[in-house]
Every structure is written in structure tokens, then in C-alpha cells.
């Protein structure tokens, strides 16, 4: 098994709408020793507006936004080529810090919008993990595992910059992609060194299939969770093997063994439904596709409240839960009802194409066309747009052409796309994406807030930076005002 540790810097925090600005990644061998590294940056396409805050965090100035050697499309192509090359010889685990909910989502959606297979991390034998999950589990078992500091709420700070700095690593250029990648490797390397017997256990759940296999084969185990600023251990038992997944989200459901399961079994269906609303919850969710940490039951048995209960009783409860198919069916039926009720209250607005990655896979025909489309020259790319079965793919292809080769677009098509971009970025409504007005408000607030210095050394330095990116967005606004 090899590892690719990686990090992205983007122009926004919303994964449906952000764009990759920079990537850093390091290939490591099975012993977690570096083999190769890669870093690249691209220009921001001018059909979208960045957030001022994101650019301040990763110090992306106007020159970096506009003068990098690579276009956005070229960078996405390079990332795909590199990831495929590095993982071609043997299965590879992709690891980012807090990556499951951000970096992985961004790369999936960027690939989706670039007419590529979005699931490069967890297909063809590859799997993905999250360094933050490992760090949280390591602290749950040993709060002294790494040097750390407390945050404003008095909890251990799990921020990568903080952990790297306090454990002797260079963190002064944090929020540049390669530095964050290096420090992810450094922090994980320390944990591997200090908890060698746990390292493989931390990483074994990098695939959904492995997690589901554990649910079917084991009666009880320790799971780690993080909430209210603390890592916690729970001793849990999975539901019956025939029905242990959430019926909608497909995440495993387990029962906290501090609860008397026989009392739960005795509840009527309506009583059970009410019980599932109570806190603390007897039912816990294991997000099977998000690299949960699952460990031997002995770890949770050492902590309160499980250490006050007879181990034989805990094992008996686990066996009863695992073998009660009716209870599992009732729980899953209630979860189904709850999910349907929630869906009825959600917005009925049609989603934008950028928000639809999880509404369906590309057809075999469109997947075949993806490769041909990327190999074609710009004029042939234009001619191929109407061959896609899925309108989303034609839409994304046209946006790539608008940004990369606008001169080959028919005038009517160019004007139509430009009007659509203008409607978005010049909107004065509250939108899901960043508008020009959103940017100006953000920029003005940052000018006035002396507490938000990011990594700028002086206020004058910050103001000069903000003036530069403000000019960039003003020019963008002028470009689209006549659309």
C-alpha cells in the first residue's frame, strides 16, 4: 500500500462553488517514507468571483490569480494524470487533513465539472482516509500523544498549523498547499512513531467495504467521535447483519452499549421512535464512506461509563443487539420515515448543475466520450458537445470552452454563456455562490477588522493586498456589465 498525502488551496469554502488554486501532494511508500512530491498553481477562471477571506488565508494575490503558468483546466488535467500515475502500480490510500469533508469533495466536484471520473480516490483499488480522524483518535486514547495548545473554549486545538508548530515543524507558511501537505505527513509520522501498534488499525477503515465487513463480522467495538471540542470513545454493537445501514444515507447504525438493550427491545414502535429523539442517543451513526476510526472494544471498556459495567454484561448486550433482526428493522424503518419527513421540508428549487454530482453517474456513453473530448482539439470539442446524453456534461464542456478557448465559440453561444455568468456574479440577491457584491462586503469588513490579520505582518501590507484583489474583481465586474 502506498499513500498520497495532499492538500488544496481554494478561492471559497463552499465545495459546490469553489475553485482549486493550488495543490501540494507527496507520494509515500508503505513505510510512510517520501518517494516523490508535486506542487502546482493555476489561474482563476474569470467566470467566477473568489472570496476575499479565502484569498487572504492562502495569500493568493492578483499576480497569482492571473499570471500562473497553468489555466484551471490544465491544472485539473495535471492532477488527474499525476494521481493515476502514482497509483497505477498498487492500491493507494489518499489522505488529506480534514479532507473527507473538504478536499475530497472539492476534487470530486472539480473533476465532475471538468468531465472526468470524480471518484479517483476510492476506485480501482484506491481508498481515502482523513488525517484529522487519525489525530482525533490518537488524542482520544492519549491526550499527551502530541504537544498541543488549548483553543478559546479550553479544548485541545486540532488545527494543523498549531500541531505542526508545537511539535517542532516549520509552520510559518501554513495554508500553502505543499507546506500543509508536509506537516500532515509530519504529524501523522509522529503518531505512527508513538502509537505503532495502532497505526494499521487507524487506517484499516479507509474503504466503505471494510467498514461494512466489520459491521457484519464483529459483535462489539470501540468507535471514536468528536463533538463539543473533545474526542470521545464509545463502546458499540452493530445492528443485525441484514439491516444495519441507514436506508437512505447508507451509513452503519450501532447501539451504544451503556444503554440496556432489553429495555429498548420492549418499547413499542411509537415509543422507540420517540426514544430515538432523546439525548443522549442510544443509536450512533458510523459514516462508513468517511474513514471512521473503529478499534478493539478493550479501549472503550477502560473509560467511563463502560469501565463501571460488567464486561460480560456488555458482551451479552452486544450479542442480543446483533441477533435481533426485528429491532434492526424497526430502527431502520423509523430512520426512513425521519429522512422522508426531512426531505419534505427541504427546498424544492431545482439545483444548479454544479450541485448535482450525487444525483446520478455518467452513462457509459458519456464516460467514453469524456476521454475522446479531452483528446480532441478545441474546435472538435465544440462539435462534440451535442453528443453527450447528459445536458450537464454539455453545459460543463461549454463553460470550459468559454474559459479556455472563447474565440472558437459561435457569437450567440458566447453571448448566452456570458449572460449566464453575468446573471450569477452581478446578482444582488443572497446566492449560494459568491457575487461581486458579496466580495466587496467581505473585503470592506476585512479592511476594518484589525483582529483579522491572517499572516500579514502589518495593516498596510493587508490593505495593499486587499486593494489588489479588489481591483481584480472590479475589472471582472466591468467585463460582465455589458452582457
Kindly give the residue locations of the regions a language model identified.
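Active-site-proximal helix-loop-helix substrate-binding element of RNase H-like nuclease domains
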Residues: 42-58, 62-65, 126-179
Amino acid at each position: 500500500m502506498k499513500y498520497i498525502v495532499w492538500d488544496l488551496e481554494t478561492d471559497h469554502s463552499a465545495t459546490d462553488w469553489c475553485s482549486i488554486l493550488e495543490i501540494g501532494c507527496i507520494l509515500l511508500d508503505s513505510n510512510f517514507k517520501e518517494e516523490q512530491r508535486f506542487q502546482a498553481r493555476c489561474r482563476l477562471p474569470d467566470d467566477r468571483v473568489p472570496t476575499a477571506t479565502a484569498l487572504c488565508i492562502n495569500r493568493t494575490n492578483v499576480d497569482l490569480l492571473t499570471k500562473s503558468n497553468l489555466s484551471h483546466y490544465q491544472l485539473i488535467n495535471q492532477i488527474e494524470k499525476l494521481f493515476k500515475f502514482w497509483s497505477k502500480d498498487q492500491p493507494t490510500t489518499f489522505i488529506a487533513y480534514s479532507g473527507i469533508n473538504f478536499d475530497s469533495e472539492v476534487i470530486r466536484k472539480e473533476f465532475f465539472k471538468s468531465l472526468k471520473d470524480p471518484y479517483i480516490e476510492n476506485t480501482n483499488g484506491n481508498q481515502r482516509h482523513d488525517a484529522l480522524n487519525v489525530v482525533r483518535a490518537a488524542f482520544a486514547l492519549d491526550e499527551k500523544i502530541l504537544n498541543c495548545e488549548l483553543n478559546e473554549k479550553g479544548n485541545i486545538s486540532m488545527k494543523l498549523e498549531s500541531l505542526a508548530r508545537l511539535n517542532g515543524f516549520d509552520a510559518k507558511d501554513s495554508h500553502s498547499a505543499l507546506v500543509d501537505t508536509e506537516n500532515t505527513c509530519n504529524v501523522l509520522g509522529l503518531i505512527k512513531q508513538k502509537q505503532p501498534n495502532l497505526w494499521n488499525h487507524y487506517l484499516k477503515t479507509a474503504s466503505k467495504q471494510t467498514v461494512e465487513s466489520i459491521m457484519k463480522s464483529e459483535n462489539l467495538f470501540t468507535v471514536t467521535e468528536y463533538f463539543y471540542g473533545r474526542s470521545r470513545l464509545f463502546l458499540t454493537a452493530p445492528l443485525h447483519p441484514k439491516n444495519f445501514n441507514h436506508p437512505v444515507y447508507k451509513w452503519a447504525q450501532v447501539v451504544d452499549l451503556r444503554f440496556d438493550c432489553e429495555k429498548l427491545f420492549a418499547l413499542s414502535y411509537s415509543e422507540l421512535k420517540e426514544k430515538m429523539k432523546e439525548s443522549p442517543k442510544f443509536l450512533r451513526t458510523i459514516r462508513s464512506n468517511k474513514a471512521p476510526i473503529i478499534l478493539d472494544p478493550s479501549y472503550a471498556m477502560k473509560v467511563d461509563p463502560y469501565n463501571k459495567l460488567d464486561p460480560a454484561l456488555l458482551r451479552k448486550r452486544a450479542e442480543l443487539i446483533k441477533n435481533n433482526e426485528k429491532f434492526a428493522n424497526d430502527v431502520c424503518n423509523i430512520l426512513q420515515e425521519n429522512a422522508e419527513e426531512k426531505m419534505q421540508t427541504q427546498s424544492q428549487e431545482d439545483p444548479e448543475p454544479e450541485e448535482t454530482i450525487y444525483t446520478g453517474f455518467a452513462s457509459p456513453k458519456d464516460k467514453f466520450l469524456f476521454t475522446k473530448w479531452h483528446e480532441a482539439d478545441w474546435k472538435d470539442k465544440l462539435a462534440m458537445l451535442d453528443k453527450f446524453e447528459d445536458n450537464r456534461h454539455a453545459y460543463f464542456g461549454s463553460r470550459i470552452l468559454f474559459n479556455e478557448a472563447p474565440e472558437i465559440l459561435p457569437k450567440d453561444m458566447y453571448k448566452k454563456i456570458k449572460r449566464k455568468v453575468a446573471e450569477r456574479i452581478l446578482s444582488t440577491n443572497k446566492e449560494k455562490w459568491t457575487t461581486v457584491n458579496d466580495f466587496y462586503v467581505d473585503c470592506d469588513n476585512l479592511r476594518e477588522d484589525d483582529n483579522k490579520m491572517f499572516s500579514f505582518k502589518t495593516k498596510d501590507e493587508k490593505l495593499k493586498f486587499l486593494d489588489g484583489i479588489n481591483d481584480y474583481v472590479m475589472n471582472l465586474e466591468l467585463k460582465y456589465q455589458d452582457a
